From Swiss-Prot:
BP GO annotations: carbohydrate metabolic process; N-acetylneuraminate catabolic process
NCBIfam families (UniProt xref): PRK04147.1 (NF003164)
Keywords recorded for this protein, A-Z: Carbohydrate metabolism, Cytoplasm, Lyase, Schiff base
Protein name per Swiss-Prot or TrEMBL: N-acetylneuraminate lyase
One example GO MF annotation: N-acetylneuraminate lyase activity
S-S bridge residues: none
Catalytic reactions on record: aceneuramate = aldehydo-N-acetyl-D-mannosamine + pyruvate
Assigned EC number: 4.1.3.3
Family (UniProt): Belongs to the DapA family. NanA subfamily.
Phylogenetic classification of the source organism: Bacteria, Bacillati, Bacillota, Bacilli, Bacillales
Alphabetical list of HAMAP family matching this protein: N_acetylneuram_lyase
Length: 293
């Protein structure tokens, strides 16, 4: 299973209308774009880039369903089902598993200061209820939850905890995880550090900017794995120029505007996120043209 899940994934964007409802046709277009145009291996569905923590349980199910119906069985699909409500996480996990998602992923429980034993049991309860494989979603900058190498060991002792989506800048810990658990899947979550992560031995990556810049990510990943580090860095420099500009304009509305430039209905971000600021339009047009986005 771990080998099947290796590769590059779009952290899938989700288009909303002005009332905060999912635009299904736009979602289908975004999913197809990631696979057919950006040439990615799979989709990570209902993660941070899908504005997951701003939407209802029924919307999450709707997104899981539409994406699966759109791409079928030929694309790797990972369902992010993490929720502070364990019952909801289990319900979503069962639903995604029934749809045929290849693995589940769940962000570490956050906001409340949960103990590691509580966090570990949360994952094991989801696995027990769904009988699907689990990829830990470690994003300490947003959750405040730091998992130590010893704690990763306790999680990885469960045969169905197959890996981690590692969205953290601690490359010492990443190296330690890679050395200690050579058979576990590690997917990098920082688009701007793909060269460094690949050198550190990750099996793939999941990125929000891969929705529009996946082809460069593929070049970086392949070159770094071939040991062509200087060449990989040159493309990473361009990628980071793109990322820096996109972040300055607001990541989700800006990525959706880039999709719109391709004739894709990128929709709006979910409130309270603001829509794209039109004062950035000329700069965005320049970015799209310069980097052929």
């Amino acid at each position: 299973m771990e080998d099947k899940l290796k590769g590059l994934y779009a952290a899938l964007l989700v288009p909303f209308d002005e009332h905060g409802q999912v635009k299904e046709e736009g979602l289908k277009q975004i999913a197809k774009n990631a696979i057919e145009t950006e040439k990615l291996d799979g989709l990570y569905v209902n993660g941070s880039s899908g504005e997951n923590f701003l939407i209802s349980k029924e919307q999450k199910k709707q997104i899981f369903r539409v994406v699966k119906e759109t791409v079928g069985d030929d694309v790797n699909l990972i369902a992010q089902i993490g929720s502070l409500d364990l019952n909801e996480a289990i319900e979503l996990g069962k639903y995604a598993t029934e749809l045929g998602y290849d693995a589940l992923s769940a962000v570490t429980p956050f906001y409340y200061p949960f103990s590691f034993e509580e966090i570990k049991q949360y994952y094991f309860d989801i696995i027990e209820a769904t009988q699907n494989n689990m990829i830990i979603y470690a994003i300490p900058d947003l959750t405040g939850v730091n998992i130590s190498i010893e704690q990763f060991g306790e999680l990885f002792n469960h045969e169905k905890v197959v890996g981690v989506k590692y969205t953290a800048p601690n490359f010492f810990l990443l190296e330690r995880i890679r050395k200690a658990f050579p058979n576990k899947l590690i997917l990098s979550g920082f688009d701007e550090m793909l060269v460094q992560a690949t050198i550190s031995g990750v099996d793939g990556a999941i990125g929000s900017t891969y929705n529009v810049n996946g082809r460069r990510a593929r070049q970086i990943f392949d070159l770094a794995r071939e040991g062509k580090i200087a060449e990989a860095y040159q493309i990473q420099h361009d990628t980071n120029d793109i990322i820096e500009t996109v972040l300055s304009m607001g990541i989700y509305p800006t990525l959706k505007e880039i999709l719109k430039s391709r004739g894709i209905d990128g929709g709006l971000p979910k409130r309270p996120f603001r829509p794209f600021d039109e004062s950035h339009r000329d700069a965005l047009d320049t970015l799209i043209k310069k980097y052929d986005l």
